[in-house]
């Protein structure tokens, strides 16, 4: 099992766009078959190093690659490129 973890820091003044991005990202659950579970969360502490996190679980690294290249994921991801100042990701075996 693979856990795919992504964190974002958003530009100031982009709160509405960030909320739209996170809402659409969460909506991918159930739409892309290879996603086993996922959680999209905002930081509980204002001013944290990162503003939001995605934690998804997949059976294999191949499933992670399929997810990353799925047109629905690509479309949602494109919403984030202009509003983020930083993004970090890691895939770990669980």
Model-derived features: where do they sit?
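Short S/T/G/P-rich N-terminal loop/turn motif that feeds into the first structured element of a domain
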Residues: 1-52, 59-69, 92-94
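A common structural junction motif
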Residues: 29-32, 74-77, 84
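Sterically constrained small-residue positions within well-ordered secondary structures
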Residues: 45-47, 80-83
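Short, flexible helix/strand-to-coil boundary loops that buttress conserved ligand/catalytic motifs
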Residues: 68, 77-80
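Charge-dense polyanion-binding interfaces
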Residues: 81-94
């Amino acid at each position: 099992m693979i856990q795919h973890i992504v964190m974002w820091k958003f530009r100031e003044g982009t709160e509405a766009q960030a909320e739209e991005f996170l809402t659409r990202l969460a909506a991918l659950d159930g739409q892309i078959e290879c996603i086993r579970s996922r959680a999209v969360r905002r930081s509980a502490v204002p001013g944290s190093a990162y503003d939001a996190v995605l934690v998804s679980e997949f059976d294999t690294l191949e499933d992670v690659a399929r997810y990353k290249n799925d047109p629905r994921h690509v479309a949602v991801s494109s919403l984030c490129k202009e509003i983020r100042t930083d993004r970090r990701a890691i895939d770990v075996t669980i």
